[in-house]
Amino acid sequence: MASPIASAALRARVKRPSMLKKLCNPEDMLQHFPNGAYIGWSGFTGVGYPKKVPTMLADHVEKNGLQGQLKYSLFVGASAGAETENRWAALDMIARRAPHQVGKNIAKGINEGRINFFDKHLSMFPVDLVYGYYTKDRQNKNLDVVCVEATEIKEDGSIVLGASVGATPELIQMADKVIIEVNTAIPSFDGLHDITFSDLPPNRKPYLIQQCRDRIGTTSVPVDPEKVVGIIECTTPDQTLPNSPADETATAIAGHLIEFFEHEVAHGRLPKNLLPLQSGIGNIANAVIGGLETSNFKNLNVWTEVIQDTFLDLFDSGKLDFATATSIRFSPTGFERFYKNWDNYYDKLLLRSQSVSNAPEIIRRLGVIGMNTPVEVDIYAHANSTNVMGSRMLNGLGGSADFLRNSKYSIMHTPSTRPSKTDAHGVSCIVPMCTHVDQTEHDLDVIVTENGLADVRGLSPRERARVIIDKCAHDVYKPILKAYFEKAEFECLRKGMGHEPHLLFNSFDMHKALVEEGSMAKVKF
């Protein structure tokens, strides 16, 4: 295949002329991906990920019938694009994956035992990578090759990332070889990043951040030019999907939270402009941010993982002063709006590595208000964020525990029920005992559903159970949960073991009823 010729757009983005000598076709990189290689990709929540090389490798496997014969250990800061990692999973190209993923095929591979998946707190993953934890059992202690999407290569050879940072600095730090995809379909993000690396103990330093807009790093990622084995032009934008619109349930949850914030301000526990907000992904998170737009709060700040379209509305309303994250995951129309109004948003946003955006040290110092959606919450305020029925992996822990363990306000918001195959309210999200625990009773302050808000700060386990059942459970499940709790309380207090009453032989009867009868509501204690 003939060597590619640099386009005018690529020449404008690559400011170090010697780098253009490494311009190549994706197919030229095939030699760097032997079976069993440990590889890394840039990207976080489906933006800023490499596209050309992963697609080339998938095409190669599909064309030559090599499914299951070219398999890799894949490390990405969080999830990459569905058309890359999800396709790899469908072609049986992933042997091992960490620390977070999104996609039906990759989840299927994990739950069928074909992919060894290890989820980890997102603040810890890049650090553990640099510690050598993920390469400790192989002769080569580094990653074999890392593919990175950039929007510019500067004169010194450092790279300007795109819509996410994630674990890219640490992946490059641990790479033997680096392939850079320069995306000319989107603007250069020069100046929008604050790049830091993870040092090893005993030489680690504190993150000297006291406000959301503080900078402690550089605007680009240093790369050893000797590591770079290929430069490829990419003309494909991130393939994101429209955001989920808020429904009545999400809007009701948002209303309860706004009322709670107003209550905390009135009692002097929050300033009038609140404290930095962290919000997860999904329609409830969107509804909360939308609720803030129509509230009386102003001069807000955001310290979070991912910024979505609703934050643009909050900026445009004049109520959001500054937002920092490790990723901006807009919908296609959101990105169009962002690029069109670049000058309005440019100095109000900052993207950091996930080891900083999710750093417990900073979250605790800033007093962040952390909000996330779980799979289920139990009556004592333990939460399950990952494993349905205790066994089926969804996406991974992500950064939920980074924030919920360390925020000033640790909030779990969830619908009170979800539908099963046969019952619109067949799954209660409030259960007697979580089938898997990611956040403990010691971490959470507030549980909120569309029915109400349970403030469990300072409450004993039995007090928590009563308020969670009363405020949060769906009407269908309130009598069921009360019956379980009252029976457990009676039996355990009678035996002198009633601090946190449980009947272990009944704790999962609701889950059993779901499996056997199609609805938790059909439980019989």
Swiss-Prot record:
CoA binds at G280, I281, G282, N283, I284, N395, G399. It comes from the Eukaryota. GO terms for molecular function: acetate CoA-transferase activity; acetyl-CoA hydrolase activity. Keywords: Cytoplasm, Hydrolase. SUPFAM superfamilies: NagB/RpiA/CoA transferase-like (SSF100950). Its EC number is 3.1.2.1. Its main location: cytoplasm. It catalyses: acetyl-CoA + H2O = acetate + CoA + H(+). It is found in: Cytoplasm. One of its GO terms (biological process) is acetate metabolic process. It is an enzyme of class 3 (hydrolase). GO terms for cellular component: mitochondrion. It holds the Pfam family AcetylCoA_hyd_C. The active site is at E305 (5-glutamyl coenzyme a thioester intermediate). Required for utilization of acetate. Belongs to the acetyl-CoA hydrolase/transferase family. This is Acetyl-CoA hydrolase. It comes from Neurospora crassa (strain ATCC 24698 / 74-OR23-1A / CBS 708.71 / DSM 1257 / FGSC 987).
